[in-house]
Amino acid sequence: MGKLTLLLLVLLGWLQYSLWLGKNGVHDLVRVESDVAAQQSNNAQLKARNDQLFAEIDDLNGGQGAIEERSRNELGMIKPGETFYRLVPEQSKRQPAAPATQDNQ
């Protein structure tokens, strides 16, 4: 009976070692779960970006309004006959520019 008990204890110890510290053990499971969570977060961000780009493509394919808005905002274009007015904030509201210095060395 003593040899069987010793054999079962050794087998139990080996199984516990492989469960906690061995390949595909608990440490690997925790690492893989954190990797999966990080990848799912990255996938969600990329999906949101893709959805935004697809919506922009649909807007651009849908008509001239989106193209006109984009050309006005990004390129500063205006229609023929329009007058462009630029509103400049007051000096106190603008960020002060860095003073230009010259080194006379």
Curated annotation (Swiss-Prot):
Transmembrane intervals: 4-21
Q: Which domain of life is it from?
A: Bacteria
UniProt membrane topology term: Single-pass type II membrane protein
Chain ranges sitting on the Periplasmic side read 22-105
**Compartments, record wording:** Cell inner membrane
The UniProt keyword set, sorted, is: Cell cycle, Cell division, Cell inner membrane, Cell membrane, Coiled coil, Membrane, Transmembrane, Transmembrane helix
Return one Gene Ontology term, BP aspect.
Answer: FtsZ-dependent cytokinesis
Please provide one cellular component term from the Gene Ontology annotations of this protein: plasma membrane
Coiled-coil ranges (or none)? 28-62
- InterPro entries linked: Cell_div_FtsB, FtsL/DivIC
Q: List all topological domains (Cytoplasmic).
A: 1-3
| Segment forming the signal sequence | none
Q: Which family does it belong to?
A: Belongs to the FtsB family.
Quaternary structure annotation from Swiss-Prot or TrEMBL: Part of a complex composed of FtsB, FtsL and FtsQ.
PANTHER family reported for this sequence: CELL DIVISION PROTEIN FTSB
**Function per UniProt:** Essential cell division protein. May link together the upstream cell division proteins, which are predominantly cytoplasmic, with the downstream cell division proteins, which are predominantly periplasmic.
Name used for this protein in its record? Cell division protein FtsB
Phylogenetic classification of the source organism:
Bacteria, Pseudomonadati, Pseudomonadota, Gammaproteobacteria, Enterobacterales
What is the primary gene name for this protein? ftsB
